[in-house]
Amino acid sequence: MAYRKRGATVEADINNNDRMQEKDDEKQDQNNRMQLSDKVLSKKEEVVTDSQEEIKIRDEVKKSTKEESKQLLEVLKTKEEHQKEIQYEILQKTIPTFEPKESILKKLEDIKPEQAKKQTKLFRIFEPRQLPIYRANGEKELRNRWYWKLKKDTLPDGDYDVREYFLNLYDQVLTEMPDYLLLKDMAVENKNSRDAGKVVDSETASICDAIFQDEETEGAVRRFIAEMRQRVQADRNVVNYPSILHPIDYAFNEYFLQHQLVEPLNNDIIFNYIPERIRNDVNYILNMDRNLPSTARYIRPNLLQDRLNLHDNFESLWDTITTSNYILARSVVPDLKELVSTEAQIQKMSQDLQLEALTIQSETQFLTGINSQAANDCFKTLIAAMLSQRTMSLDFVTTNYMSLISGMWLLTVVPNDMFIRESLVACQLAIVNTIIYPAFGMQRMHYRNGDPQTPFQIAEQQIRKFSGSGIGWHFVNNNQFRQVVIDGVLNQVLNDNIRNVHVIKQLMQALMQLSRQQFPTMPVDYKRSIQRGILLLSNRLGQLVDLTRLLAYNYETLMACVTMNMQHVQTLTTEKLQLTSVTSLCMLIGNATVIPSPQTLFHYYNVNVNFHSNYNERINDAVAIITAANRLNLYQKKMKAIVEDFLKRLHIFDVARVPDDQMYRLRDRLRLLPVEVRRLDIFNLILMNMDQIERASDKIAQGVIIAYRDMQLERDEMYGYVNIARNLDGFQQINLEELMRTGDYAQITNMLLNNQPVALVGALPFVTDSSVISLIAKLDATVFAQIVKLRKVDTLKPILYKINSDSNDFYLVANYDWVPTSTTKVYKQVPQQFDFRNSMHMLTSNLTFTVYSDLLAFVSADTVEPINAVAFDNMRIMNEL
């Protein structure tokens, strides 16, 4: 095409020179006529002889003919000189360029099974703490007392519901819940032991140290600590470790030990873990060269099929999943090798087309875009799009008949569903109106947009009516995936007539029938161009058969490594495919077989398994959190935050760009799913022990007492002088939750007006301020006025304040005869006192086992050399030499 342009400019220059010469000749003729008339009219006699100018003109004519022949030779030479420019300068514009999104690929490959995390400590909500004892006058005693307090007492500031605290606690438990516990890995030395014994973890050891050093600890307890050590039963592969735990923490850890996810691992399990189709593939040799020990363990991946049906009405989520799957699939599709030399093939095509300097432009376009990069890109795009079920769109030029004829092969081999409808219709319409209808002399097809039938389906009927027989290409209209469930996974399988390449032979018959038609309404050049294009493709029948088998084999081999159902729904965005790159693939495919290496297959399989397993675990977490929120009566809790957190933990989604309607639809689907048993049991454990957890917190009260008359502060051993009530004897009680639910505050108002204190019972947060004066100033405004006047209980925050020897206001009590009072009292139950004997537990686990996360590392795999490349029907993939 480049040499055409240059030739065209040379011809244009020649034409310009001719025009200039013609003008000069006209002027000369006029001058000659004038001179001739003058001579005729003049009476002078002149002798006429040959002028020197005429002799010069003859010489110039001879020279010009020589120059024209030289220019013609130059024009002919440009074809050879500029073939490379044809290939690289102009035509590479039509090559599809794929830019791999490295970040998405890295995110996918970085998803590792979370089972690999190693536990170094037991799970704990509580820890024992030493608290001082206060005398009646507010001074500290020298003795102290041990209480169980919350390890993470994190109630955020602001309007916060205690129920949300428990929801966050549950989320924390789910995050820290171990998949397996091996106590030997976390055991540490007991410093106070007589015989270098070990306790279960470092926190147990530090508690033992603190108790041992406490002066008030009994001698019997010290002696017991000195005896604390592990007990091994080697014959049963069991070890017992002493631990110091709150009874609730013990229940958690005992549950984790009893419900570990690890299972015994042996060679059979590993071999069966490999997809069956790869195990049975004669092109691969799989071998295991060692046995696993009896202590080998693994965690079975969670490969439940998609319970959310993300392909159904989740357009942006589905688009993201298919995009990431497409990028992953492209990275594992093998590169073509030993392709036909591009220059040699273009030269051969030029000879077949009998290209000359003055050949019509439509035939020179046949060579457009043919190069090995485009061929390889097309091969990878087709297989990766089918594996990820990404929709493709076709890009083509109607005047390039060769690319349209190549498109006929593409539509024969790749199911119609893989292309966006509008693009498929446009391509089929171009083929019908450019090749098929002109062959029979039929008028152009005018396709009505939105017609349920495709142009090919309409053409099939019209040609049968027009000519009495079709062109034998009806199979292209029935080219759909077959849905087959293999090993519990829905696979989109190519039809058997594609896999055994019968369709290629039928395609060739149809093309040959088209080339034999007369093209009655078209010029001869048009007919010749179409026939030559068909000839170019039919000359490579053997290679097309091999290419189709190669495409099908690579697709099906990689498909065996897909673990999630291959749902087919058209995607929002599409992968562009140039028909010129399809021409490159058809014309340059050689006879070298390429199949995925075993290492590539294993890598692809592992990444798919890890993503799928993580996906299911995150679904289980989200379902559990939603169920917990409902059970805790958090009706006003925004579920969108839970769904956003779920999507973030899947790594591949840009959560901020997901539309709200899809977020809420996702929430509704998550609500319908059942909770996984382990997560449900854990929540029930928390629910049963909410009272103990509230008691251990310094920020949660069990109620508030309000009155019109001031109530005196009372002495408390744990705090000094405080507005804390330890029991509700003598108070009228109202349930805080019922009050908030009904909104009827008349009962409280009546009681307060009758000077009767009211106790509102229920968990609620309280704030602490050490300045008594500022507290007394705030009290009426913050608590009393809100309940009686505004009647809003949901913002109630009872205020705890204390006056003791640690307080800034202790001097008020020490130096003055002043009795501090308050209109509110905080109802707070006493936390559980630490008792060494009740906190001492023995935990049992396996003495030793080894958890393997990468099962395929034990399998040595190789391809059969030389590659037999046998397809599903025991025929060689590449037969053509």
UniProtKB/Swiss-Prot annotation:
The keyword Oxidoreductase does not apply. The record marks A220, F224, M228, M840, M842 as: Interaction with the intermediate capsid protein VP6. Residues 394-414, 422-442 are annotated as: Hydrophobic. The keyword Repeat applies. It is found in: Virion. One of its GO terms (molecular function) is RNA binding. Residues 1-45 are annotated as: Disordered. Residues 19-30 have a biased composition (Basic and acidic residues). The N-terminus binds RNA. It is necessary for encapsidation of VP1 and VP3. The N-termini of 10 VP2 molecules form a cylindrical hub underneath each 5-fold axis of the inner capsid. Homodecamer; each decamer is made up of two conformers of VP2, called VP2A and VP2B. Interacts with a VP1-VP3 complex. Interacts with the intermediate capsid protein VP6. Interacts with NSP5. Interacts (via N-terminus) with NSP2. Belongs to the rotavirus VP2 family. This is Inner capsid protein VP2.
